[in-house]
Amino acid sequence: MNLLTTKIDLDAIAHNTRVLKQMAGPAKLMAVVKANAYNHGVEKVAPVIAAHGADAFGVATLAEAMQLRDIGISQEVLCWIWTPEQDFRAAIDRNIDLAVISPAHAKALIETDAEHIRVSIKIDSGLHRSGVDEQEWEGVFSALAAAPHIEVTGMFTHLACADEPENPETDRQIIAFRRALALARKHGLECPVNHVCNSPAFLTRSDLHMEMVRPGLAFYGLEPVAGLEHGLKPAMTWEAKVSVVKQIEAGQGTSYGLTWRAEDRGFVAVVPAGYADGMPRHAQGKFSVTIDGLDYPQVGRVCMDQFVISLGDNPHGVEAGAKAVIFGENGHDATDFAERLDTINYEVVCRPTGRTVRAYV
């Protein structure tokens, strides 16, 4: 019996993929599976996504891209975080597309002795993170166009404010992106497959789908914009087994610093999940867990290995071994948990680590 588990519902992943594929229409569907498929386990998740409609996969690092090939993913794979100093030749040999995110990246690929290299140019259209800056566009485009072994499959950019559908910055970025695309084609780059839509843009701006869309979070069943509902099914549940139930007297405290004290005689329970497992220490007093459909507030400081919940006078007889849902099925969803912690659901599903055991259902 595992004390701390993330349950991953692969049927939910399959369902979400089918929903997104239908929404994509004629556009290709790229599944972003970086960070171990948003902490859902890429070895199990990616094949399910591949089998239910994904045309391509997107990852951050070379290691993530190579892992997809190792587990048998045959679709196109795009890697967008790498450096010219890395050994990227193995990725080229395994037909992995590499993002050109700066002139230095373009130069490294142009100078690589390879018969054929597939690249996608990342444009910095306003996020001001990675991507080719406007003053660099012409030089990069002309250099890539002159390299016979380079195939530019397309261009992409990342939107800064897509989770705010009314924010005008998105349209400003699209104008810049289209300007870059026109300039690239003027220099002889066909750029047949282009994409700008992350999950929020994909779900709120169908006019921006272009030739491909690039959602990530939505595959895991979470909505990226408050108030949206697209019939997605959350795939992750984080749950633990209560390890101890004990009585506490009025005025007695619990956990380090005794920062919480019981107002009345009652019971507390220990849940074996701490900051070493991804539960942030600053979550003290901000959330509750669900046991048999009832909420119990977290009290006192979150420790490295455990936290405490108040059972009141324990009218429902919670005992050691009871299942405490931190978020997910039969409990608060990841978005609600994130709001209580003043963060986003993207971060919340990436948090369960440490001694957490992943189980697939």
Curated annotation (Swiss-Prot):
Catalytic activity as recorded in UniProt: L-alanine = D-alanine
Record EC number: 5.1.1.1
Keyword Transport: no
GO cellular component annotations of the record: cytosol
Entry binding sites for substrate: R129, M304
Enzyme class: isomerase
Molecular function GO terms recorded: alanine racemase activity; pyridoxal phosphate binding
UniProt keywords, alphabetically: Isomerase, Pyridoxal phosphate
N6-(pyridoxal phosphate)lysine found at: K34
Endpoints of the signal sequence: none
Top-level taxon: Bacteria
CDD domains: PLPDE_III_AR
Cited InterPro entries: Ala_racemase, Ala_racemase/Decarboxylase_C, Ala_racemase_C, Ala_racemase_N, PLP-binding_barrel
Cofactor(s) in the UniProt record: pyridoxal 5'-phosphate
Biological process annotations from GO: D-alanine biosynthetic process; peptidoglycan biosynthetic process
Catalytic residues (positions): K34, Y256
Subunit architecture: Homodimer.
Similarity remark: Belongs to the alanine racemase family.
Matching HAMAP family: Ala_racemase (MF_01201)
Role of this protein: Catalyzes the interconversion of L-alanine and D-alanine. May also act on other amino acids.
UniProt xrefs under NCBIfam families: alr (TIGR00492)
UniProt protein name: Alanine racemase
Species in which this protein is naturally found: Corynebacterium glutamicum (strain ATCC 13032 / DSM 20300 / JCM 1318 / BCRC 11384 / CCUG 27702 / LMG 3730 / NBRC 12168 / NCIMB 10025 / NRRL B-2784 / 534)
